């Protein structure tokens, strides 16, 4: 199953195709028969292009219709009717043909090659045929979720962060749920398909598996579609699009394409109907065979146009409706829907003000008229009527962190399904976070967990009769009978609350079963946390259903059952729990007895599911299995009792430890994560870990022997190591907490695991690390020493006690309180005896000190107890048996070394008695072993290698003894057998070395090397045979058949391996050549040797023998021998690295062996056997039940009461929890985890900083808008103040006001006029509004920033005639020139201010304006603003001028002054430069260059203004006549009239101009000083920049005169000319 998923998910179409050509042809024929294409067959000329049909194709590209096939309506009607009317119809003017385009695409041009399946189909294709194609031919799995992405077809830009979040969320939602993604398929610039494709591309580059992204595109819109034509072909597709073409290319990140064809070219719409029908059909499919839910569909909207809004409405009107997720911030339709969703009330009602705002937004977004916007608004309101189905994803919102949560939450909230169905959906998606956050919340439909307790019995009865119906066929019969029993309880179920609770519990239990089957570990944990009682849940039918499931990871359980049953099983074989019990016994091996195979369980199982009782009634619980009763009568009675068991009894219908059964199921089904989770739950965790370790190890061994894939065996072995490590860690954790309790965990009886102990399970699993743990070794050491207390030289003391028994009294003994391993009964008996002895031997006087108390304890132990405990200690038994064995070997040596008489000697009789008694001991070991059957006992006994050695040695000795008692020659044969047999007895000594720390590992090395050498001997035999046969055949061609040939083949080649080559060996005494031994003996015809003997004739080919021998020795003596040495070396280091564990493991075997042996060694052991038989018979006669128990449970086992067992389990659970807590803390503190957490935090911080940056930019734009509006309000307030002043008749000359801002829509002349009004006291302040920041600076000279303000409007001034012509140039910057006035140029203007600079200040004047000396230490910053300023020519006065000039914001006014034929530039809102004479300003230009150097640019070069600034006195001057033209007066009057302000005329007769030369106060504006000054910039209320174009030509002509009273503007031009110029440039209204 898992491999099929991998094959379908990976995209290798060539390996998925059918293996036979017949099936390929059949599939190809089915595709061509089922799917069609559409072609236009009737030409209806288009009104726009007569050479092109209404379908979009050229008229010459049409194909004639098939003669045998006609359209749906007759051709004549079509031609005469629709053709004449000019209406083109798909159904009437197109014809279906078998599809000719399907196969595989290979995308090129994207930097890497991707493959995708594609097919061209008609727009009206049946969706079931398409789904069949996708599942069967394309090998796709049915989705668990369908995400349909809709959005803009044109290019649009997404914010980088939003695009990243959108892509990650979409991919995660699809990956975690196994979803399909539907898109438009074609990329048009940066459309929504491109954005989805980018996300898919990022995913495919980071992971191997590809998501299933299906593009449903119109065939007529596909670029290079001619390359796709072909039947079942592989085509190369170029993704580079033609910029001049209206068609679009397919997106190369998709895996499949369905190209809908309706006969049109270059038109969208063919795919809409097909896509919707396919989505509807997929939603009707079931997610899983276990889950009844259909495939949920969700719409995802990103950007989009008006058609997307219509699609959303269609989704919401579906039955059932389809929930929609809208991505806010992506633009256009998405933002409009998000806005409406946010501010719309339930039922689609929105506030009037918001309604108007939404309508305006629709008009601006889609360029709609009012009627169109109202129509679209109505559609949006229809969507908002089902607001609960629309989920809006807003990036950075608190409730939603990513897109995937929005999608999955929308599916749960949007669909009106019940809570169990929602749980099934979350389970199918494997999204436990969704279930935890959205489903398991308390509400009106969710019962609190505490309310589940009262109706326990009814729930159990209801749920127990429900599940068996789905498990086996025969179990439906019992259901009806069971209902008869439950009918009495119907009255209790009439309460709707109880029924609701019961349904909820049943839904939770069904979800638990599904979660276990689908291997959803997190869901199992969640369900347990939310009230699922596993004892109520787990039943035999459900457990068997779990064992028979085909879902989940692949496993080898059926193979194991087949091996155990030793027969071929049918494919639909139903595995029962009895089969599982046999499998467990087979895997565990040894004496393990599974509860499923015990008679009590089998009888109950047969009663419930066999022919005696109806099948599938209730749960079956497992109670502690009692010892099998002996005797036929007892068996019959027991069977009757089991038949009469009340199955309805809850105590019987429960598994005592349900987590045990589930963990074993998870292990056998190869579900490691589930097994580890179930291991943490429940009791006896250490035993469960060891059982899992053994099961996995046995399964790995079986899979390796079955020649399965190596990966399976390796995975199983790794799982075994994981559980073994868990067992060791748990033992270490418990040992740290309490040593004594940890030792109890090792030795207490496990009733659920074949009455074994943890130590036995660890030995069965060959878990060396567990046995080598300090806790286990302390326990073994206590057991090894018994009650003896010896620290140094224990072996010597024991030998002395054995050889000299009185020394036993001088040895130290321990009390029973010090024992860690004794059973509870033995401990109590020992304590009672000890207390009696203490009471009997108590001294009258009191003793003090610990030493005296210790002495007292030692003296209180009686001599008999000391002797008994001494000989019962395993260490004493070991040395006793060892001494006995060594004595036996000495006698055996004597027997075979001396002459053997006809009748055995006394020494030989002792040897024979030793062997016979040892054989009886081996028989006793077999009979008293744990397995029940004798065959099983023998099988377990033979699994030990030393037992096999003993069996062979004893058997050989018995045969030799029988032959030895016979006459000659049989007696000689018997003696020879004796001689050979003693070799095995000497080898048996190696077992004694196992107790030694240093010799024990070497014994294991020898065993492993022997196995390695067996493989080497096979290889050596091949080489030896090859040379031996060739040599023998060449040197002895005339040999007769004889057995000596076999000897001669191996004899010489074998000894050559050890270096003996037999080169020219000669017997010097006899001088006889041993020709058979020579390599190349002398030979020849008619030749004689030195002694005159005739030489044999030469053998043909004898010269080859030395060459063959050289090659043989090279291979055998050098290559193979060194190879064997290398293998031995590897084995040595392998065992040496674990020598400590090996020795400790062997030590356990030795200790347990001598712990169970009788005290006396052979041959005296016969007395112990007689004692055991007598005790057994006496115990049976007395009917002591304890006797069987004690005899059966001899060994290292602790029997605990129920209360003690409960405390032990609680201690173990605490250790497990603390262990995982420490492990989690360790993982969190690891470097990798810290790096991961740090990277996540840094990423989150960067995202937050980006958000803050975006918000800051938005706030800046908002503040600029607010600032602009405030300036407008300020200007309006100024106007109102002026109007009120005029109305109140207040003289403006008495008011001194300074306004720092003016409206951006005011004229420059009006601002000058206003400034003069504010300065009517005689001290002029010129206020100009510049477009830039508010920059106030103080200069030694009169310098100012560039006069970009004058680009706004041309202002004409009356100029004093000094030159022939006066010309008004384009101002660029202000420059103070104290020198003589330059020659006048045409159009040049000068601005004069009357009054000498040295005039003293009068009381009541502006206190901020005063004359003062220049400060040479002042900060000179004019280099940045006016770099041409010459400080040497600056006058010794400080004059500051505040200049304010405003610009209009509307494009109409900008276009009026700056036509479109010049360069454009950005405009900024108005700012001010302030200059005043004698004033020391607090604000300057310190940050001018830093803030504006990067954004200011020179718009155009301008000429220079030269303006004369003079002080004005109260009296009129006669030197400078005041000239006012009539046109200027008229214009001034019109300006004031336009602003509805009746400004009184200022008396010009009071103004006088001083006689001071003009050259001392000139303000010059030069072109080169505009560098670095900000351009005119303006922003709309929405923050969008607007462009304006300057017009230098309009600045050249004269404007209107200023109406200020303190400005004398003189011009050289005639008054009439000035008037004409002034009339040609009317001012705009402020």
UniProtKB/Swiss-Prot annotation:
The keyword Protein transport does not apply. Residues 474-485 have a biased composition (Basic residues). It catalyses: Ca(2+)(in) = Ca(2+)(out); Mg(2+)(in) = Mg(2+)(out); Mn(2+)(in) = Mn(2+)(out); Ni(2+)(in) = Ni(2+)(out). It is found in: Cell membrane; Endoplasmic reticulum membrane; Cell projection, Axon. Keywords: Cell membrane, Cell projection, Coiled coil, Endoplasmic reticulum, Glycoprotein, Ion channel, Ion transport, Ligand-gated ion channel, Membrane, Receptor, Transmembrane, Transmembrane helix, Transport. Residues 825-834, 845-855 have a biased composition (Basic and acidic residues). GO terms for biological process: calcium ion import across plasma membrane; cellular response to light stimulus; G protein-coupled glutamate receptor signaling pathway; metal ion transport; monoatomic cation transmembrane transport; protein localization; protein tetramerization; retinal rod cell development. Residues 1-877, 966-975, 1030-1107, 1180-1630 are cytoplasmic. Residues 1-25, 65-92, 453-492, 620-643, 824-858, 1362-1414, 1575-1630 are annotated as: Disordered. Residues 1235-1255 form a coiled coil. It is a multi-pass membrane protein. Residues 69-92 have a biased composition (Polar residues). Inhibited by extracellular zinc ions. Inhibited by intracellular Mg(2+). Activated by the neuroactive steroid pregnenolone sulfate. Negatively regulated by activation of GRM6 receptors in the ON-bipolar cells. The chain crosses the membrane at residues 878-898, 945-965, 976-996, 1009-1029, 1108-1128, 1159-1179. Glycans are attached at residue 1129. Interacts with TRPM3; the interaction results in the formation of a heteromultimeric cation channel complex that are functionally different from the homomeric channels. Interacts with GPR179. Associates with both guanine nucleotide-binding proteins G(o) and beta-gamma G protein dimer; implicated in directly regulating TRPM1 channel open-state. This is Transient receptor potential cation channel subfamily M member 1. The gene is Trpm1.
